[in-house]
Each structure stands twice: as structure tokens, then as C-alpha cells.
Amino acid sequence: MVWKRMSFIAVLLVLFAVCFYWMNQSYDPLARYPYADDADREILLEYLDQEDINYLITQQIKPEEIMPFIAVEGFDIANTRWYSTALQAQEDDVAYIVNFINEYRSRMTYSTLEDILTHYSYSDLIRYFETSDDYDEQSELVTRPDEFTLVLNGHKTVFSYEPSDLTLLEHLPVVSTQSESKGFYLRAEAATALQQLMEDATEINGELGGGLTIERAYTSFESQVALYEQAVSEHGEQASWFEDMPGESEYQLGYTVSFALNDSWEEQVEIAEDGSLDYSACEEKLSNLQRQQISWLRENAYRYGFVIRFEEGKEAQTQKAWQPFTLRYVGVENARTMHEQDSCMEEMNFASS
């Protein structure tokens, strides 16, 4: 009786072992993954281990997200959606994208990845990540540098961003430039508005622009490097009152324009130890025409969507010395509101305006 019972148990164990073997042989690790066809399944099983497959299933990663990258050396399944989003935002070699994300993912957030790669090239981002400490070690990359009400303060940087619709300022009075200069540019909307402003400013003295002469408009990162270093050479620790670090200048956005002023204006600004600024010597140098131009811009620039970017009396907010001939395009409605409220950009909440 005991022998029969033991024989029966042995048979059951053998049957269990055989069944378990055949179940393992027929087990499909991708049984809970409904997205792949036979060809994709074969590749997935070739490159992924069980832990990867579990991640694939729980995160519901689609074949179109993973298949372009799965065979690339260094592929990390946890970065799959980063790779896919990067490729959609800015096409490049998939191996390059995998290496880029693996190396710099910690410097970005997934929620802003698409915006960043819409406005900055991979090479520019690498250069920023590797050299951002050169001027401002606290700099923070702006993810959407194309917003026309963007204020570059608090260590915000657009690094080497270049607007896509820069428009040459033609048929307007400009200062003489070096022969290699390609002229002055603004973004298309701002350029159109400036054209109208200059035409209407003729009423100041009968000349196109009312005697105003464009001296500066869109400025590239490389040009800003030279301008900032020149300001440091001339003003030392006070340089930030007159010029911004490369990447942190609003001229790089393509919405800011300046007209020629007396060469000695900055030198004549007196900065006290308490940070107060005195423009008495500057104003003494102003001609009657310049006084008329300043008055006209204060009274009329908003009608064309421009504001005096660094106005007198707003130094505490802007952290810049008064620059009466520097205009910033913010759109007609915003400019009108700022004019009526006597506000500078730092005092505005553009998101609700």
C-alpha cells in the first residue's frame, strides 16, 4: 500500500515536471504586450531581458518609440521616451541622440525637452552644458526663448539661441558699420512695427525717423561676448548697469533696438555707493533734438508696441542705468498697459495680460 502511494506521488511529480518544462518552453514574455507584430517581438526578445520587458509593459512603451533605438549601443530602456521625444523634436543620428540623452538627461526635465530641442541644437546644448559656468555659474536655460514678453533676469539665459524670423531693417537710417557687417535685424513683427514708428517719427524734424539712427538691434551670442567684455574693461564691477552677460542680453531675442546716443553717455552716469544713479552730466550733453526725440518716444512708442526698456526711475527693478533710446517690442496691448500704468517689464505679469 505504501509502495503504491509512493509510486503514485512519483508519477505526479514527473507529470508536474514535464508540464512545467513545456509551460516554460511555450511561455511568451510579451504575452501582456499587445502592440508589437511578429518582427518587432523577435527584436524585442533579442535585446531585452525580463526586467526590461516588465518595464516596457508597465510603461506601455509603443514599438515606434523603442524600435529606432533598441539596437544602439548604450541604449537604456528607462530613457526610451526621452530618445523618442528628442528625435521628433530635432532629427539626428539615433546613436548621437542616445549618447546625448544618456549624458545630459540630468541637466534637463522631460516636460521641457521638446521646447528645448525646438529652439536649441544638440551641439549648442552640449556647449552650454559644458561651458555655462564661463560667465554665470548660476545661469538657467530658458526653455521657450521665442516668447516676445520674455524678461531675462534672475540668471535666465538663452545662450546662443537665434530667432528663426530675423528680418533685415531696410530703408531705415542706421549708423555706419564695418564692411563685414550684414546689417541690423529684428524679428519680423518687431521689424514691421519699427518701420511704422520710424515713418511717423518724421514729424519730429521732417526727416525719416526724426533724426533717430539705429545703432543696435538683434545681437548674436558671439557679439554679446565682445560687448560684455568691453563693458567690463570700461566699467569694471559696474559693467552690469550697462551690459549683460552673453546669453542674458535681451538683444539676443530680436525684440530690442537702440538708437544712437552720445558716445559719452555711459561715462557720464554717476553711480553712488548706495547704488543710486545721477544723470545730470548726461542730460547736459543732450542736444535740443535729442530732448525732442526722448519726449516723442516716451509719448508715442507704445502706439507701435514698443516701450522704453530701461527707463529713468526704474533702475531698482531693471538693474540697468537709464537708456532713453533703447526700445523693447512687447506688442501694442502690453505697451499701452505699461504706458498707462508707468510700469517696466519687471513689474508686469504678462501671463494674465
Where are the regions a protein language model picked out?
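Extracytoplasmic cell-surface/polysaccharide-interacting catalytic and binding patches
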Residues: K4-R216, F221-S353
